Structures are given as C-alpha cells and as structure tokens.
Amino acid sequence: MTTTLITGANRGIGYETARRLVEAGQRVWIGARDAENGRKAADRLGADFVQLDVTDDASVDAAAETLRARAGHLDILINNAGILGEVAAPDNMTAGQLRHIYETNVFGLVRVTHAFLPLLRAAAVPSVINVTSGLGSFTLVQDPERVESQYPLAAYGSSKSAVTMLTVQYAKAIPDVRFNAVDPGQTATEFTGRIGHGVEEGAEAAVRIATLGPDTPTGTVTDRSGVLPW
C-alpha cells in the first residue's frame, strides 16, 4: 500500500487531495499544526494523523520519527501547507512580512523535505509533490487574459516562484526521488475567500501525479490542464 503524507491537509485542497487518495487505496497521513482539527479530519477520512508544524524544526523532526516508527518508509510527500500572509503592495512590503510568508511556503517546504528524505529513500518509487501557484509564474502574471495578472501579491507570488525553482533543483540533484510541482489554480477555499473553482478541480493535478506510480515523471510543473508556463 502506498504511504502518503500531506502537510496542511485538515481542510481545503489538502483535505480533498487526502480524501481522493484514501479513496484510491493509499494510506494517507494528514499532517496539521492544529491537533484537534487534524485528528477530526483524519477520522472523517479514515486516514492517519500526525501533528506537524512546518515552521518548527522539532515538530517536523517528531513527525518524521512518528512515520519512521509506524510506517517505516514514505512513498509520497505532498508539501501542501501554505499561507497567503498579509497582503501589501510592493512599495509598502516589509522584510518581516516577506519572511513570515516564506517561513511557511518556502523554508517549511525545505524543512519537511529534508526531514523526510531518508524515509522517502526507503520507498521503491519515492515522490515529492510541491504545491505551487500560477501567481509565481512570470508568464501568467504578465498576461492580461489570465486571472493571475489581476492580483499584486508580491510576497506570496514570489514565494511560489521559489517553490517552483526548488522543485526543479531538487529534481536535478536527487534523481532517485521524483520531484514535481502542481498548481491547483484559483480554488474556492477559505484561503481565497471562496472565489474560484471547486476543491475537486483544485486537487486534480496533485491527485494525478500521486497516482502515477512507476510512471511518475520528475521536474515537471503542471496544473490540471497540463504544463504550467514558467
């Protein structure tokens, strides 16, 4: 059975991704900072729960030890946890605001990936799926026909540009693990103020990559329609 960990999966796109992968027969671990809500989400889905705050070294290390003891390996890691943070125009943006967003969206991804890499390498076909965004695409944010061009989210967007580049660099440096990035698109969750398509569509790209098995590629950046322009 495929063992999968999804960070930030107690609600929204992460929760829907977990639901679909449980339905597909995977053993899914829901990683969440909020233990109460995380356990409730896991119980509803028939998944496992591990408390995991991606901004805290000790929390991430403890979560990795829990999976090592109870699962022995990790087939798929989905770095889904992310925050929008305080929205500020570039001319009013401070280093502190940027650092706060990067701590979860970028440093958290690196922290979790580093901690779980030994468990991934213990799997037959290990895979890491990083949730990025079209708001981090140079092409899309400059295309007036795209919704991404309408949101001046410099801090969040640049954090997702970093996620995309990290994915590509991981893929180049670690050929024994598949690394791919997926863009859910504008999805109607608490994160977006309920604007956009449904979570079913938002989870589609991650679910597709997570169910490819031995055919999983590496170094790709996609949304549910195909290759995401960089």
Walk through the language-model features, giving the residues of each.
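Canonical Rossmann dinucleotide-binding motif of NAD(H)/NADP(H)-dependent dehydrogenases/reductases
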Residues: 1-29
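Conserved glycine-rich Rossmann-like NAD(P)H-binding loop of the short-chain dehydrogenase/reductase
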Residues: 24-40
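Catalytic loop of short-chain dehydrogenase/reductase
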Residues: 83, 87-102, 121-172
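A glycine-rich helix->loop->beta "capping" turn
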Residues: 66-79, 85-86
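The beta1-alpha1 cofactor-binding region of Rossmann-like NAD(H)/NADP(H)-dependent oxidoreductases
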Residues: 50-62, 95
